[in-house]
Amino acid sequence: MSRIGNSPVAVPSNVTVTINGQNVEVKGPKGTLAIDVPEPITIAQEGDEIVVSRPDDHRKSRSLHGLSRSLINNMVVGVTEGYTIKMEIFGVGYRVLAKGSDLEFSLGYSHPILIKAPEGITFAVDGQTKFSISGIDKQQVGQLAANIRRLRKDDPYKGKGIRYEGEQIRRKVGKTGK
């Protein structure tokens, strides 16, 4: 029995949910998100709650049950509050600059790296080493943060690189010379 899938999704008063077959569209103060729910899962709106149910207890139905409920909940939270991921850069000469709505990174390569903001994503730069990624789609914000982090992953020996704010990197001891 899916503990996540069985709990209904609460819908605030300023959010409108439209269910059209397997398509769910959520409109809120920050924007609109839509998703196609996989086939065996059924969605129904009961008052100010969305109930996600499955027809049987097959393994695939059970896994899609919790997934569908979580995706709908993430959409409701996204259009009301939004999602923000804060990141920081460590390293001598490593910095980030805001170029309009885009970010330009200087990460020790021979060229600067320009990251364009996808539609629905905004960047905020705080100083030269801290920035944040904001948007209403949790998956898009998280994927963009992971792609930016991959530009210069943290070095366990020197501690240089891009990391999430508050992330602790396990440091390694270097070779001891004679």
From Swiss-Prot:
Pfam name, any one: Ribosomal_L6
Keyword annotations of the record: Ribonucleoprotein, Ribosomal protein, RNA-binding, rRNA-binding
Superkingdom assignment: Bacteria
Gene Ontology molecular function: rRNA binding; structural constituent of ribosome
One GO term (biological process): cytoplasmic translation
GO cellular component: cytosolic large ribosomal subunit
Purpose of the protein: This protein binds to the 23S rRNA, and is important in its secondary structure. It is located near the subunit interface in the base of the L7/L12 stalk, and near the tRNA binding site of the peptidyltransferase center.
Assigned protein family: Belongs to the universal ribosomal protein uL6 family.
PANTHER family recorded: 60S/50S RIBOSOMAL PROTEIN L6/L9, LARGE RIBOSOMAL SUBUNIT PROTEIN UL6M
Subunit structure: Part of the 50S ribosomal subunit.
Protein name: Large ribosomal subunit protein uL6
Organism name: Corynebacterium kroppenstedtii (strain DSM 44385 / JCM 11950 / CIP 105744 / CCUG 35717)
